């Protein structure tokens, strides 16, 4: 009653049939032999755009909490490496996309709005959040059955200390 149909297309199924690997040494040799290199996918220098400059490198270092006061040659070297990364991302994105372009660059954004710091958490705000925690308890997250009596004692001590200050 049921009709099954299976069809294949040589255009869609591409593969390579290799000889049978008979022992661990053959498997090890096969796995050691590389078939491609990531450097083959890195575009040549003329295809690399200069989206990243020393200003962007300084900003990335500052946002990462690293020392941004590097000598200019070092900043230029970082910018060159990051431009190579962006070009690589674009190249890999283009390999798997029907539309060519700088799709990868949209992922590589350095907008100030992406890095707005949250307002600092004060002790009073933290204590307020702890008081409201019972309103947000979830069975799905396994938050029932936790004994908060010890926790409440410590919180009340901290609260009284904060009020004295």
From Swiss-Prot:
Signal peptide: none
Ranges of Basic and acidic residues composition bias in the record: 137-153
Additional free-text comment from the UniProt record: This protein may be expected to contain an N-terminal transit peptide but none has been predicted.
Protein's GO biological process: glutaminyl-tRNAGln biosynthesis via transamidation; mitochondrial translation
EC number: 6.3.5.-
GO MF entries: ATP binding; glutaminyl-tRNA synthase (glutamine-hydrolyzing) activity
Summary of subunit composition and partner proteins: Subunit of the heterotrimeric GatFAB amidotransferase (AdT) complex, composed of A, B and F subunits.
Gene it is expressed from: GTF1
Primary location group: mitochondrion
Cellular compartment(s): Mitochondrion inner membrane
Stored InterPro entries: GatF (IPR027499)
Protein's recorded name: Glutamyl-tRNA(Gln) amidotransferase subunit F, mitochondrial
Pfam families associated with the record: GatF
Keywords noted in UniProt: ATP-binding, Ligase, Membrane, Mitochondrion, Mitochondrion inner membrane, Nucleotide-binding, Protein biosynthesis
């Amino acid at each position: 009653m049921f009709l099954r149909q299976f069809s294949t297309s040589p255009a869609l199924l591409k593969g390579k049939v290799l000889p049978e690997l008979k022992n661990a040494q053959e498997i090890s040799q096969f796995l050691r032999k590389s078939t491609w290199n990531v450097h083959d996918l890195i575009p040549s220098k003329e295809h690399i755009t200069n989206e990243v400059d020393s200003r962007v490198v300084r900003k990335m270092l500052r946002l990462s909490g690293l020392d941004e006061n590097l000598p200019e040659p070092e900043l230029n070297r970082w910018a060159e490496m990051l431009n190579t990364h962006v070009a690589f991302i674009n190249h890999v994105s283009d390999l798997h996309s029907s539309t060519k372009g700088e799709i990868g660059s949209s992922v590589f954004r350095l907008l100030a709005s992406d890095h707005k710091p949250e307002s600092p958490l004060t002790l009073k705000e933290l204590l307020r959040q702890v008081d409201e925690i019972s309103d947000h308890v979830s069975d799905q997250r396994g938050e029932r059955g936790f004994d908060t009596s010890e926790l409440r004692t410590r919180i009340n001590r901290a609260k009284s200390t904060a009020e004295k200050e």
